[in-house]
Amino acid sequence: MAMHEEEEVTAEEEELVEKCIEIIRQEKRASTSLLQRRLRLGYTRAARIVDILEQRGILGPGEGAKPREILVDLDAAV
């Protein structure tokens, strides 16, 4: 799969992606653990959403335990 090619996302996952973007916009930070806590998701599901947001160019790559860099102005994107 090409680096910028996104895996197929279900309608349910897309709804979750939108909720995650809103949380990231409010918190001004992004991490798998933040999404797990705020949305009561398991690690695998939260990590998949973070991967989708990275593929879409919204979040930067992971750097260990540090929060992800937010690459777009989410306030302007609303």
Per-range role (PLM):
Residues 1-78:
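C-terminal intrinsically disordered, low-complexity extensions immediately downstream
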